[in-house]
Amino acid sequence: MNIVRTAQELETLDESIAQFKSDKKAGAELIRRAKIQGFSDFQIARAIWKDKMEDCHMQWVREYRKSLGIVPVVKQIDTLAAEYPAQTNYLYLTYSGIANDVKYLGDKKSIVVLGSGAYRIGSSVEFDWCGVQALNTIRKEGYRSVMINYNPETVSTDYDMCDRLYFDELTFERVMDILELENPHGVILSTGGQIPNNLATRLDEQHVNILGTTAKSIDNAEDRHKFSSMLDSLGIDQPRWRELTSLSD
């Protein structure tokens, strides 16, 4: 019954958010409730604009909630099950809190590495190895190493491997939340595989300092049409290919 009641509450909240544009004051409180309940900026924007939603609407929700002070706080994961006081660098973000458990210097002496997320076909342990090597190199160069990843199977989610580990989702919203707190020297995407690569263009649009492979180069390699055109312009042979989007194709 708890699952059914929770689902009903979320559905009711979703319907209430849809009335946001007609009552901004009530809408602000709804956004606060929605974030505590786990709604993303994308889901809030979709509830408001529905089929007319565009990427700019999601960004509007983000900027609006920030203007209201609706931002997540950072909490430490208790690795000792409350038996003893635990001060760890094992972190997560939540809207169900008041203050951060850690202090932020904002001195641009840290570098953030985005992990590979869940293992799947085409993205496995090799990207985890790359991420760990990046963390080791960052430390050797005198910077604080920061990892964002959520896969407990990986070596990169061992909090002894870096100065700060955010065990959290690899979405644009959450990554930007962390970057705004950390204010790092830069971010490394190219060691994490597909998921970080998918964020490259949007992070670049927010003027995030992407270290290593640039967002433009990542996009040129990821977009099959752009990559094919580049090979043609360079006179490099390539196999014939087609993009299939339906069964009839």
Where are these regions (language model features)?
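Extended, well-ordered protein cores
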Residues: 1-5
